[in-house]
């Protein structure tokens, strides 16, 4: 993987860059649609590529490991061939599931024992095995195995967890470096900064991650319930330490406002289930603000979903029709809303990049944040 930093905004730390992988190029800032089990819910690959214009998607190691399983994925030739996605893929390591499956797992120095949410069967992930699993899945960018601490989190626990994550990272790097890609193309390993909401821990973790000198870096353990101000504060702390010549990935973030504010702090990559999850509940992000399509005010509104939208569904379908589908619980309603929301997120980061390059990102961002806070 190569990263070319094209320019930095004169009034903030926002950056425009280009990531090159063996499955194609990624213009940054970038939003990555989440395909947890190998699919972005309700969206065909052709729609993702041609209509939404996604440049990279995300898969979930924990879910793919359990189903369809490594045997099927390896026989298929990796996730790209299994799901037909021709562009880059990023996989997380399962560390977030360590956090989210708190009732089903046990953490020790060696690794994590957890019970499957599908059938209750027991499994054990070590940092080394997390690398092996991601070699089989075959994503272009893979993540180190870490523990994502909850919020709130007591200082002592956050410190011990961070230090263990650092030890796990060394084991991940050793395993990654002694193995090769199974499918003939390059893979890249990103370490993850942790430290909860403690300034000194975030600084220490960022310094350690930077010292590992990998090709890109991630920030984890944010957007887990802490106030947005804490998210921005600790993103700011970390991005001032991580090297500028490598991409920075803020994991699991977030709302359009979160994305805009952290682009301004120097973040390059984002993922979040929000656009598709909200879509399935009738919540739409538009260029003028936020819409609950189930509200009665849209019942006879025959205007396009978003006249400024970039996807086919934005101009072809009306708000009234989408409301009808959503209220009726028709599958098509969730599909249309998902395509719209994902297209909006991709449009948002593309516009951010355009304005960073043009030199007017700050005033554009200020106006967009105002619009994104508006409920229509």
Specify the residue positions occupied by each region the protein language model found.
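Short, well-ordered coil/turn segments that N-cap beta-strands
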Residues: 53-55, 85-89, 138-141, 184-189, ...
